[in-house]
């Protein structure tokens, strides 16, 4: 039977956690200390107190661990939805959703900063992270009750991913507990996103087959459309 290596420093990982959760936590701890390109499964296994076989059973690559972390953040944000915001305008709902996301990320801020720096140096990593972010942003749009399905939803997701990346840069340098700079950047970004969404709606009027399913109008009734100024 393979021995499980002793866990390296970084604070104890709760024994009740699954191997998958231990690996994700170990990855984020290591990311706070070094570049993602320097992190391998050997280091992750040692930090998590697991074997390489345990790691291989859960993940195929280091980027897959990052993807699993992103998915877990999505889950936390979606689980923490506030029904009191249901009557708010879409832009306000999306603002609340994205601020919940940043709150969920706060514990691993140093790791996120490290990952962002690596992405600026590595185009392939940047492309992979963009794909993860677009998928996450489609879930965030859905959480805000803003359409995120189909080609139009993909465009909204990509637009929101770009906006989110910009806000994330502000957040990484915002040491104010109240996150005043971050909230201001997000508010400005969502205002720009609403204008961009209006242009997207106009485009879909002329290219309905690409933006809307066959047999359905490319534009919602006027009164309904005005209630959904999508952010991206």
Predicted regions located by residue number:
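C-terminal peripheral helix-coil segments that are non-catalytic and often amphipathic
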Residues: 2-5, 173-232
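Short, hydrophobic secondary-structure boundary micro-motifs
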Residues: 40, 113-115, 128, 149, ...
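Alpha-helical DNA-contacting segments of helix-turn-helix folds
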Residues: 31, 63-73, 77-81, 115, ...
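Amphipathic alpha-helical interaction segments
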Residues: 22, 43, 96, 114, ...
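Basic, helix-initiating cap at the start of DNA-binding domains
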Residues: 1-34, 43
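Helix-turn-helix
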Residues: 22, 30-68
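Amphipathic alpha-helical packing segments from all-alpha helical-bundle domains
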Residues: 123-146, 154-166, 184
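Hydrophobic alpha-helical connector segments
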Residues: 81-114, 121, 131
